[in-house]
């Protein structure tokens, strides 16, 4: 297929976004001779590995084999849902080998690597998922060594676990930890989601929304500075101000903790002097960018009413009816949010979140689709 237009490389960087959009539009509208669209799974900007994989499955005749090496984000990212559906519902996805980013399977490639094996035509009933794998488990005789960790995903349970998105959970290597993750998934899969208006906390009929912090740290950098006692400005909360101490998550900011060392990173970029004002009420916030090596992924904390939030922090926009319900039950909105934060920081929900995480960003979609059981339904995961 020849794409129309002038695709000269002599363009300024400001034009690249428009070029990508035009390329995406043309590829999405590319049709076969019978009028059907050639690519059914393209969403947003063109992603070459998705395009190559879909085209490969089209070109190989039924019962032929397709093997491809792609980023392992395909297993869980939202934008790959249409491609996973095609692999499951119209083809036989037989195996996947997942190598996490720390294995450095290819020199210079820092992201995780996934090896897919697909038989074209038919549909998938069972897929054997190997991982997390180590580079030393690759075998020149059999592909993988016999003791490589794996799990079999069967269609009935897989459908329930993912609500038809066909994501593949990220599993730990340790057998005991794997059982804990599977137990958490099985216990939570049928629970209502946080953003569903039918959940136990929300009688309003209005969904709980997840919002990104109001201050873009790049665009407003001139209005963000080091915290200085007595200086003009209000507290600026970003991801680094979330502190974990045991099982407790709290905000560690010099405006609320005078013992923070003068050289501490919590003091840098901690003061806001721009025109956007604090919301005037406490909020329940979650760190949006996490270190993959941390034991915990979900880090919820209540932020005070006199601060603003950076875009490395997400927060819940709760309907008035939910806030009133929390205040009535716990004495105040602030105390109610503290109770809710402890619930959302439960071990069970964190196991779920780590299993389905696509990357190091805790995005709005992930939080909105988080299972939301009642507190009495949360229990310790042990095997």
What is the meaning of each model-derived region?
Residues 70-75, 102:
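Conserved short loop/turn motifs at secondary-structure junctions
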Residues 37, 46, 50-53, 57-60, ...:
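Polybasic, glycine- and aromatic-enriched phosphate-binding surface used to engage nucleic acids
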Residues 1-7, 11:
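Single conserved hydrophobic/aromatic residue that forms the stacking wall/gate
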Residues 129-131, 142:
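Trafficking entry modules
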Residues 79-96:
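Conserved Class I S-adenosyl-L-methionine
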Residues 9-28:
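Flexible glycine-rich, low-complexity coil/linker segments exposed to the extracellular/periplasmic environment
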Residues 26-41:
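Short glycine/proline-rich turn/loop motifs
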Residues 74-82, 379-381:
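Catalytic palm subdomain of template-directed nucleic-acid polymerases
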């Amino acid at each position: 297929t020849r794409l129309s237009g002038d695709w000269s490389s002599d363009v300024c960087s400001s034009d690249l976004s428009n070029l990508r959009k035009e390329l995406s539009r043309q590829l999405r509208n590319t049709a076969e001779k019978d009028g059907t669209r050639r690519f059914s799974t393209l969403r947003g900007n063109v992603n070459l590995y998705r395009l190559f994989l879909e085209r490969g499955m089209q070109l190989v005749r039924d019962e032929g084999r397709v093997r491809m090496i792609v980023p392992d984000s395909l297993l869980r990212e939202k934008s790959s849902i249409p491609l996973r559906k095609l692999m499951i519902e119209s083809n036989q996805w037989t195996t996947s080998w997942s190598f996490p980013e720390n294995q450095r399977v290819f020199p210079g490639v820092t992201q995780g690597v996934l090896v897919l094996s697909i038989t074209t035509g038919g549909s998938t009933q069972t897929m054997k998922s190997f991982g997390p794998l180590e580079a030393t488990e690759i075998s020149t005789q059999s592909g993988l060594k016999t003791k490589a960790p794996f799990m079999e995903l069967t269609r009935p349970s897989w459908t329930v676990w993912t609500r038809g998105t066909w994501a593949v959970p990220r599993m730990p290597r340790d057998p005991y930890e794997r059982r804990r993750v599977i137990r958490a998934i099985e216990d939570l899969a049928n629970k209502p989601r946080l953003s569903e208006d039918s959940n136990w906390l929300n009688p309003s009929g209005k969904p709980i929304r997840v919002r990104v912090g109001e201050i873009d740290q790049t665009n407003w950098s001139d209005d963000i500075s080091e915290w200085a006692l007595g200086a003009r400005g209000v507290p600026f909360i970003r991801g680094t101000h979330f502190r974990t101490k045991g099982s407790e998550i709290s905000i560690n900011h010099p405006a609320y903790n005078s013992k923070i060392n003068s050289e501490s990173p919590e003091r840098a970029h901690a003061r806001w002097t721009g025109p956007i004002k604090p919301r005037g009420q406490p909020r329940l916030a979650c760190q949006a960018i996490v270190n993959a090596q941390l034991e915990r992924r979900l880090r919820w904390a209540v932020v005070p009413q006199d601060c603003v939030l950076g875009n490395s922090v997400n927060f819940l926009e709760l309907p008035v009816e939910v806030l009133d319900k929390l205040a009535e039950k716990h004495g105040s909105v602030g105390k109610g949010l503290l109770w809710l934060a402890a619930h959302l920081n439960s071990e069970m929900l964190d196991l779920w979140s780590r299993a389905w995480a696509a990357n190091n960003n805790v995005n709005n979609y992930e939080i909105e689709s988080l299972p939301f059981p009642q507190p009495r339904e949360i229990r310790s995961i042990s095997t």
